[in-house]
Amino acid sequence: MNPLQGLYTFPRGMDMAPYKENFEVYNEKRNMNVQNWYTTITDFEQNPYWLVNRTENEDKRARVLALASASFKVTDWLTLQGRGNIDYVNDKYQQEIYASTSPGIAGENGRYIYYTYQTTLLYGDLMAKLNKSWDDFSLNAAIGTSITDTRTSALRLDSKTASLYYPNVFTIANINMSSSAYIEESDDARRQMQSFFAMAQLGYKESLYLDVTARNDWSSTLAFTERKSRGFFYPSVGLSWIIPKSFSMPSLISFGKVRASWSKVGNDIPLFVSNTVGHIAAGGIPQPNDTAPF
């Protein structure tokens, strides 16, 4: 709903002031104030001041972050490290659209949109880090494991053109839950990723470096696939040469580096793709799973 549309189509020979000061007028038949406009109300013909004052939005977010880490130096070249964090988010959004707004947008008694979303993300990892040099060689390496656990819960209600039982009463109980309304509910959906990873950089005379990484992830979203047990593996390898460390460079060139690398990337799939589920739509209408795998 763009208030500018009503301004663009407003006749240039008419005065906007009465519709600005009295964007709503009392309707005796409905016993309430309704939108005041010079012509029939449509999606493109609405009083812009009505839209500004009678389309109310509220968007709130509550968030809690906490983290902790600890490390222990075993030797001068070996360190053990553990980290963990939690991220909790609670989003709430609602929109109140008053009765007499365009019938293509809201029902006769108005429209109410309510959305709430909670997510809790837990992450933890353990790593052993190595940093050692000898003669012309150096080695930086790490090996570890991590876990990411995400839990979500969501509810979205939209009366759409199904309208409300009572005009301009914006509560969930007042939504007419007919088939033209919209309901989307997610009950405590959970997703977990367990990982094992390793990385190493071998250097020679501070000029030639070989980088190797490897990671394997096991995702709960792959529970109903052939990759349930083996997850997915993605490595990378790179070789770089810092030229000034090996040869003298011309005065016009301050630095030179050559690098070649190869990598493979991996990712899991969204929730419920490997095991789709049915649900109940607005009005109590069952929506069974009709997408393979059943």
Predicted regions and their residues:
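Betabetaalpha-Me/HNH-type nuclease active-site subdomain
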Residues: 3-5, 11-15
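Core domains of carbohydrate- and sulfate-ester-processing enzymes
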Residues: 13-29
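Extracellular/periplasmic, surface-exposed regions of secreted and cell-surface proteins
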Residues: 1, 8, 36-97, 107-294
